[in-house]
């Protein structure tokens, strides 16, 4: 695993700028957030393809839908906590229901805002958006996967919600020799003792936990489930059948997210599942690393849960 440290938001907007130089139909929309979403270079170089809406997320989604309806390839970018709360009706009606080709980039997702607290965390986004017919959801795990995702999304005809964090993250993938397909999981480690399924920035921790478990004689399968909707049902069922136990890891509420998707998928042929996520409480204050450690989302916490799980 490579040691490069690049923020997924930066990888996303850098790739978008590269593509937009060649495709004048690509438009970036934001809400007084060009700094936090790293769209400053895009705005300076391609002002005719950039729309600044100010702090008006509802308007931004509506404007984006209108631009998409006129044939533009629109990426509306801003803090995840606001796009899946303040502008939720517009996302539901103008994007999902109307099937307008708009991609939402929600930055600083999950607990990335750290000490800013519960008002700025987005721990409900998967649970809410996956109930909207026609809405796709992706949580890329590193800069390389994010770059592949942007290239795929430019010509993808349906609305997609992409959630990334804030800080630079280690590469999960050592090079570009891997596929990224919506609806397909990638197997990072294979094993038969249990399966760990993760999405977004928790994938790195799941992979590291898998390596730690190997040192203890436990062969864990680790799945990168960055495509949340559509989800790889076949990979989940195969993991249940072949390993008999599943742990899910998500920077999201334990309700309605990745863990719930796995349990729902296996409802007719269930196996024991442990969901590592945020419980039904306002998140403790701290930076994202401290919060991950507190709730067992880091590699040490995942490894501990796995060791306890296989002993039962």
From Swiss-Prot:
Keyword Kinase: no
EC nos: 2.2.1.13
Pfam families to which the protein is assigned, alphabetical: Transket_pyr, Transketolase_C
Keywords on record: Carbohydrate metabolism, Thiamine pyrophosphate, Transferase
UniProt catalytic activity: apulose 4-phosphate + D-glyceraldehyde 3-phosphate = D-xylulose 5-phosphate + dihydroxyacetone phosphate
Gene Ontology MF annotations: transferase activity
Pathway noted in the entry: Carbohydrate metabolism
Cofactor: thiamine diphosphate
Membrane spanning stretches: none
Assembly and oligomerization: Probable heterodimer composed of AptA and AptB.
Function as written in the Swiss-Prot or TrEMBL entry: Involved in catabolism of D-apiose. Catalyzes the transfer of the glycolaldehyde group from apulose-4-phosphate to D-glyceraldehyde 3-phosphate, generating dihydroxyacetone phosphate and D-xylulose-5-phosphate.
Family: Belongs to the transketolase family.
Official protein name in the record: Apulose-4-phosphate transketolase subunit B
